[in-house]
Amino acid sequence: MSEMTPREIVSELNKHIIGQDNAKRSVAIALRNRWRRMQLDEELRHEVTPKNILMIGPTGVGKTEIARRLAKLANAPFIKVEATKFTEVGYVGKEVDSIIRDLTDAAVKMVRVQAIEKNRYRAEELAEERILDVLVPPAKNNWGQTEQQQEPSAARQTFRKKLREGQLDDKEIEINLAAAPMGVEIMAPPGMEEMTSQLQSLFQNLGGQKQKPRKLKIKDAMKLLVEEEAAKLVNPEELKQDAIDAVEQHGIVFIDEIDKICKRGETSGPDVSREGVQRDLLPLVEGCTVSTKHGMVKTDHILFIASGAFQVAKPSDLIPELQGRLPIRVELQALTTSDFERILTEPNASVTVQYKALMATEGVNIEFTDSGIKRIAEAAWQVNETTENIGARRLHTVLERLMEEISYNASDLHGQNITIDAEYVSKHLDALVADEDLSRFIL
């Protein structure tokens, strides 16, 4: 898992997300506390539970982006889910236990990649030997059996040197590669994943591990052989256990749109996709054991981060027990004009940088001036105020409209320099921004 300090985590998040310092600090502290807990004695470590977070803020201010960037920094099993996709147990739809199953699947995939990477050097050696066996077949005795040679032959060493220098990359060889296992899809009701997994592995192993001859260039064969040899060096049982440990100790679940499962007013009949889902989430957040196809997973130390706009509902509309399981509340602020200006210029891959790079592929040089950036930010903020406030996402809409003419004619503008200043922006957007009805439908 990540050993970054809170300050380093915030610094990384600042490269992609503007403002929202309180939210960044909270997730940075929560992530660091995962590392701190692992440094404790076994007895005390079991008692330290994660402090789950509830992020509250209007749409388009960076809640989901914080989660997306956190996933890359965490170097731990991470999953982002939408609360609206689940229904109460016993009704048609996904049940909340599938969150932990999906998280475990993600952990297995992550641990497998790490294990393969760890064995890559040895796998490359084995793959090289298999290619050399095709290029320079080992000597055989009178009975057709391969003889064990103390020293590699001079020819083999010569080919090894050429292979490592890339001189044989384009040479075609025929080599035996493992055939893809027979895929069998089995639909099963929730909770029966363990049984379906066993049936699938049974069908896949019926024919054994078959080899299939394929004709490939050495460069392509090398990649496939390295993957095949690395997979052979990985112990599946160890891999599963490591993945389960990673989920239990370092797993992070991000639940988006949690405000959409709040109960609004008095309703009659069962509320299977709102309050029912909240009740089902309780044991997961509090700590329980979930059965997955890889084994039993305890959720006691998984970190849960929930987020929602809470424009119609309020955090107090969540059932009290769930409110108590989300002790850290972070409020994200609505974005201002100056925030929009920073969003257009400061992030590593800001929208303006993306448009400049896209147009450069057609030989068109786009230049955004400070006055142009300011006018774009003002236009986006103005439309947000007069219509629906969708936060930073409005910048995409405004910029797409602004760049439409250039994008359409880019192939005819090869070699030209185009400056986007306040005058250019006003010419293309003022009429739309001023007319509220047009803004509502076009921007």
Swiss-Prot record:
Localization terms from the record: Cytoplasm
Keywords from the UniProt entry? ATP-binding, Chaperone, Cytoplasm, Nucleotide-binding, Stress response
User: What biological-process GO terms show up in the record?
Assistant: protein unfolding; proteolysis involved in protein catabolic process
Chief location category = cytoplasm
Q: Which family does the entry's similarity section mention?
A: Belongs to the ClpX chaperone family. HslU subfamily.
Q: What does the UniProt record say this protein does?
A: ATPase subunit of a proteasome-like degradation complex; this subunit has chaperone activity. The binding of ATP and its subsequent hydrolysis by HslU are essential for unfolding of protein substrates subsequently hydrolyzed by HslV. HslU recognizes the N-terminal part of its protein substrates and unfolds these before they are guided to HslV for hydrolysis.
- This one is known as ATP-dependent protease ATPase subunit HslU
List the taxonomic lineage: Bacteria, Pseudomonadati, Pseudomonadota, Gammaproteobacteria, Enterobacterales
Query: What is this protein's gene name?
Result: hslU
